[in-house]
Amino acid sequence: MSHTVKIYDTCIGCTQCVRACPTDVLEMIPWDGCKANQIASSPRTEDCVGCKRCESACPTDFLSVRVYLGSETTRSMGLAY
């Protein structure tokens, strides 16, 4: 089952989320917005199992990567009525 994976611009390019993902959903891509010149990307969300290990691994105060499961997707992203 795929889940929505959102990467925020607070990503510091540390690769912790990429290394924590057991299904290789995440990868790093070039980005000039941080010192590491890279940001996490989620090109394979169809493989996401919803374990949220990427969230747990994120060292930033505001999680740079979030996994939204099912109905949580619309509610958390402000899309629910």
UniProtKB/Swiss-Prot annotation:
One of its GO terms (cellular component) is chloroplast thylakoid membrane. [4Fe-4S] cluster 2 binds at C21, C48, C51, C54. It is an enzyme of class 1 (oxidoreductase). It is a peripheral membrane protein. Residues 2-31, 39-68 form the 4Fe-4S ferredoxin-type domain. Keywords: 4Fe-4S, Chloroplast, Electron transport, Iron, Iron-sulfur, Membrane, Metal-binding, Oxidoreductase, Photosynthesis, Photosystem I, Plastid, Repeat, Thylakoid, Transport. It is found in: Plastid, Chloroplast thylakoid membrane. Its cofactor is [4Fe-4S] cluster. Transmembrane segments: none annotated. Binds 2 [4Fe-4S] clusters. Cluster 2 is most probably the spectroscopically characterized electron acceptor FA and cluster 1 is most probably FB. [4Fe-4S] cluster 1 binds at C11, C14, C17, C58. InterPro entries: 4Fe4S_Fe-S-bd, 4Fe4S_Fe_S_CS, PSI_iron-sulfur_center, PSI_PsaC. It holds the Pfam family Fer4_7. One of its GO terms (biological process) is photosynthetic electron transport in photosystem I. Its main location: plastid. Its EC number is 1.97.1.12. HAMAP family: PSI_PsaC. The eukaryotic PSI reaction center is composed of at least 11 subunits. NCBIfam families: PS_I_psaC. Apoprotein for the two 4Fe-4S centers FA and FB of photosystem I (PSI); essential for photochemical activity. FB is the terminal electron acceptor of PSI, donating electrons to ferredoxin. The C-terminus interacts with PsaA/B/D and helps assemble the protein into the PSI complex. Required for binding of PsaD and PsaE to PSI. PSI is a plastocyanin-ferredoxin oxidoreductase, converting photonic excitation into a charge separation, which transfers an electron from the donor P700 chlorophyll pair to the spectroscopically characterized acceptors A0, A1, FX, FA and FB in turn. This is Photosystem I iron-sulfur center. It comes from Chaetosphaeridium globosum (Charophycean green alga). The gene is psaC.
